[in-house]
A protein has these predicted regions:
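Active-site beta-loop-alpha junctions enriched in small/polar residues
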Residues: 73-77, 101-103, 131-136, 166-169, ...
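Structural motif
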Residues: 16-18, 54, 94-96, 124-127, ...
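Histidine/acidic residue-rich metal-binding segments in metalloenzymes
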Residues: 145-164, 170-235, 242-263, 274-288, ...
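Active-site microenvironment of metallo-dependent hydrolases
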Residues: 1-35, 39-40, 48, 89-91, ...
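Active-site mouth loops of central-metabolism enzymes
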Residues: 69-80, 135-148, 212, 216
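Divalent-metal coordination cores built from histidine and acidic residues
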Residues: 3-8, 85-190, 254, 489-494
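Divalent metal-coordination and catalytic microenvironments
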Residues: 22, 42, 60, 71, ...
Length: 565
C-alpha cells in the first residue's frame, strides 16, 4: 500500500472497516474513551466519529490493542503454527515473539527456516528471536549446533527481531568467544535473557553483555532487583511455570512501576490455553492481584511492542496496525471479537496453505539398542535425588537413603522412580540414569522426546520393562509421548515433526493428550500439575538446582556433574 493512499484515507475518513461504539483503551493517556475506530486495509486511520459500509457495533465493549506474547516456543504446543494460531487468537493474542530453539536443537538452521516459512502468511503476527544457545550448554548433546555464522543468514529477514534467550549465563560471564560472537552480532538489537536466581556481580556482568530481559523471575525480590538494572521483566504464566499470582500481588501492593513489565507464556499446552486463556489469562491474574486494568492492558500489548521495537503495534491510534481485541470487561478479559493483523475480523475459518516441511525435521529419533543393563544405576545408600517442585521448573537437590539390589543398583521405591536421558539425534549411545522424586507413578513408565532444550529422549518409571517398552514405542512412531504400564502402551501421542510437533487436528491432539494424562493419573501422578510438561523440563541444565542430561546428573547452581558412586 502506498503511503499517499493511507494519508488520503486518513484525511478523508475513507475506510474499509469501522468499529462503532467502543470503549477504546488509550495506552498513551491511560484513558478509556467512547469512540469509533476507523481502519483502512490493515492500518488504523482514526479514533473518533466514523461510519462506513463495513461496520462492527461494539455495543460498549472495550477495545484494546491485540495482545502480545513476548516470549513463546510454538513447538511446545506440540502442533504446527497454523494450529497454534487457531488456539490462541480467540483469546485475543494477535502477535507472538517466538524463539524456535526447540526445533533448532533438533534440526538446526533447517528447523528455523521451516518455522519461518510456516508462519509467513498467518493472520497471527509471528516475530522471531534467533536461538542463542543450541545446545543450551556444553553439558549435553543436541541434534545440532548453531554458531554466530549460522545466524547471519537470518539477520536480514523482516520478522527477525533479535537474539533469543541467552540461557548459558556462565558462558557470558566467562566471556566464551563463541558466545561473545553471537552477542556482538546482535549488538544493536534486543537480546533476551534467561537468568533464574542470577544476582550481584554476575547479574551486572550479564546486563553489561547486553541481555535486556528476563522471564525466569520467581519472586518479587528478583523482579525488583532485575528491574533496577534496567531489564524488561516478562511475567510468565505457562503450564509448568505458573507462580506469578503472589509476585503480581506484591507488585501491586508495593506500587512497583509496570512500564517495563510484559506478559509471556513461554511453554503452555493447548489444553491449558483453551481452559484458562492465553495472554488474557495473564491480564486477568494481574487485575485480580490489584494491578490497574489499563496497566494490565499495556503489559499485555504496548509494553512489549515498545521494548522490542515493533513499530506501529500495541496501541489504538492513527498509523498503528489494526490488530485489536474486543473485550466484555477489564476484569475477566473475556474476548468478544478479534481483528487480525490484516485488519479483518478473525473467524478461525481462514484457509491456510498446506505445510511444506524439509526432510531434516522428520525421522529424528535415532537410538541404539537399549537394554535393562543400560538402565542400571549403581549408587551409594545415600544417593542424590532430583526433587520436583509443583508448578515450577526449578528442582531441589536432596539426598535420600534408597533401596539397592545385590549389585548395589538403585531399586525404585518410596515415591522415587528411575529417570533416564538418552541421546536420540545421532545414535551415539550417550545416556545417563538418575533418581527422580515427585512424579508419583507406580507400575509404569512415561517417555518423551520433548525434553528441553536438547530434546533427547527422557523416560521415567519404576521398572525397567515398562521403561524399555516406552522407549521402543517412541522409536516406532518418530517421537512424541508414551505411557506404558505392565507391558501395555496405555496412550501414545506421535510427534513426527522433529519429535516435537504434529500436523494432526488440534482436537485429536487434545484427546490423546488427555488420554496420556489420564493414564499417568491412574498410575499415581499428582493431579494438581501437568506431569508431562514437568517431565519435559527435567533435562534442562540451565534451570536450577539439578537436572539430568545424557551426560549425567548436573548441578545447575555450581555448573558441575554429580557422581552417583
Amino acid at each position: 500500500m502506498r503511503q499517499s493512499e493511507l494519508i488520503r484515507a486518513a484525511y478523508e475518513g475513507k475506510n474499509t472497516l469501522v468499529i462503532k461504539n467502543a470503549n477504546v483503551v488509550n495506552v498513551f493517556t491511560d484513558e478509556i474513551v467512547r469512540a469509533d475506530v476507523a481502519v483502512y486495509e490493515d492500518v488504523i486511520i482514526g479514533v473518533g466519529s466514523y461510519s462506513g459500509e463495513n461496520e462492527i457495533d461494539a455495543g460498549g465493549a472495550y477495545l484494546a490493542p491485540g495482545f502480545i506474547d513476548a516470549h513463546v516456543h510454538i513447538e511446545s504446543s506440540m502442533v504446527i503454527p497454523s494450529s497454534f494460531m487457531k488456539v490462541i487468537m480467540p483469546h485475543g493474542t494477535t502477535t507472538v515473539i517466538a524463539d524456535p530453539h526447540e526445533i533448532a536443537n533438533v534440526a538446526g538452521a533447517a528447523g528455523i527456516r521451516a518455522m519461518y516459512k510456516l508462519t509467513d502468511e498467518l493472520p497471527l503476527r509471528v516475530l522471531f528471536m534467533l536461538p542463542s544457545c543450541v545446545p543450551a550448554t556444553p553439558f549435553e548433546h543436541s541434534g545440532a549446533k548453531l554458531v554466530a555464522e549460522d545466524m547471519e543468514q537470518f539477520m536480514h529477514k523482516s520478522r527477525v527481531l533479535g537474539l533469543g534467550e541467552v540461557m548459558d549465563a556462565n558462558s557470558v560471564i566467562n566471556c566464551s568467544q563463541e558466545m561473545l560472537d553471537k552477542l556482538r552480532l546482535f549488538d544493536k538489537r534486543p537480546i533476551d535473557g534467561h537468568a533464574p536466581m542470577l544476582e550481584g556481580m554476575g547479574l551486572n556482568a550479564y546486563r553489561v553483555a547486553g541481555a535486556f530481559s528476563d522471564h525466569e523471575c520467581s519472586t518479587y525480590e528478583e523482579v525488583k532487583q532485575k528491574l533496577a538494572t534496567g531489564m524488561n521483566i516478562l511475567l510468565r504464566i505457562g503450564s509448568a511455570a505458573n507462580n506469578m499470582d503472589g509476585v503480581l500481588r506484591r507488585i501491586a501492593k508495593e506500587k512497583l512501576p509496570t512500564r517495563n513489565m510484559m506478559f509471556c507464556t513461554d511453554d503452555k499446552h493447548i489444553e491449558d490455553i483453551r481452559r484458562e486463556g492465553h495472554i488474557n489469562a495473564n491480564a486477568r491474574m494481574a487485575v485480580a492481584a490489584g494491578i490497574d486494568p489499563i496497566d494490565a492492558i499495556k503489559m499485555a500489548s504496548y509494553n512489549a511492542a515498545r521494548a522490542y521495537g515493533i513499530r506501529g503495534v500495541g496501541a489504538i491510534a492513527p498509523g498503528y496496525k489494526a490488530d485489536m481485541v474486543l473485550l466484555e470487561d477489564l476484569k475477566d478479559f473475556k474476548v468478544k471479537q478479534v481483528i487480525s493483523r490484516f485488519g479483518r475480523p478473525y473467524t478461525g475459518e481462514e484457509q491456510m496453505p498446506s505445510p511444506i516441511l524439509p526432510p531434516q525435521v522428520f525421522n529424528s529419533v535415532r537410538l541404539p539398542e537399549i537394554s535393562k543393563y543400560d538402565l542400571a544405576l549403581r549408587c551409594h545408600v545415600s544417593a542424590p535425588v532430583i526433587k520436583m517442585i509443583p508448578h515450577q521448573l526449578v528442582t531441589e537437590l536432596v539426598y535420600r537413603d534408597v533401596e539397592r539390589d545385590e549389585n548395589g543398583c538403585f531399586i525404585p521405591s518410596e515415591g522415587m522412580v528411575k529417570l533416564a536421558v538418552i541421546e536420540r539425534h545421532h545414535a551415539t549411545g550417550s545416556m545417563a540414569v538418575g533418581i527422580l522424586e515427585g512424579l508419583g507413578i507406580k507400575h509404569g513408565a512415561v517417555a518423551s522426546t520433548v525434553a528441553h532444550d536438547s530434546h533427547n529422549l527422557v523416560v521415567a518409571g519404576d521398572n525397567d520393562e515398562d521403561m524399555l517398552m516406552a522407549i521402543e514405542s517412541l522409536r516406532d512412531c518418530g517421537g512424541g509421548y508414551s505411557v506404558v504400564s505392565r507391558g501395555v502402551v496405555l496412550a501414545r501421542l506421535p510427534l513426527p515433526i522433529a519429535g516435537l510437533m504434529t500436523a494432526a487436528p488440534v482436537n485429536d491432539v487434545l484427546e490423546i493428550q488427555q488420554a496420556l494424562l489420564d493414564a499417568l493419573y491412574s498410575l499415581g501422578a499428582k493431579r494438581d500439575s501437568d506431569p508431562l510438561i514437568a517431565l519435559s523440563f527435567m533435562a534442562l541444565p540451565v534451570i536450577p538446582a539439578v537436572k539430568l542430561t545424557d551426560e549425567g546428573l548436573f548441578d545447575a547452581v555450581n555448573f558441575k556433574f554429580i557422581k552417583y558412586n
